């Protein structure tokens, strides 16, 4: 188990930054240069979710230290978010983040009107108004 664990740890140290940062950075630049808005949405959703995961990790670091499978599980999850075959970031954004945003907007009817207009305009620009 010792050598296997060392190999897995080394693989994570190489694959982790490649999957979580290098490929998404490259794909984000390509998306910005393409005329399609769909890929822009995928990569913006990825960076929103990746930032959230990173913030959670910072807060929960003392607990995560004692969970040895956390980093391999995180790597698999972030790969699912990033890889174009799955489009996981768009899926999670649509099913979780956007729904929570709508609930929040529904509760704050008397909130900042400019903020609501900005969100509705962004949704309309991406063809998401239902």
Swiss-Prot record:
The keyword Transmembrane helix applies. Its main location: membrane. One of its GO terms (cellular component) is membrane. Pfam families: TB2_DP1_HVA22. It is found in: Membrane. Keywords: Membrane, Stress response, Transmembrane, Transmembrane helix. Induction: By abscisic acid (ABA), cycloheximide, and by drought or cold stresses. It comes from the Eukaryota. Expressed in aleurone tissue and embryo. InterPro entries: TB2_DP1_HVA22. It is a multi-pass membrane protein. The chain crosses the membrane at residues 5-25, 42-62, 63-83. Belongs to the DP1 family. PANTHER family: HVA22-LIKE PROTEIN E (PTHR12300:SF139), HVA22-LIKE PROTEINS (PTHR12300). This is Protein HVA22.
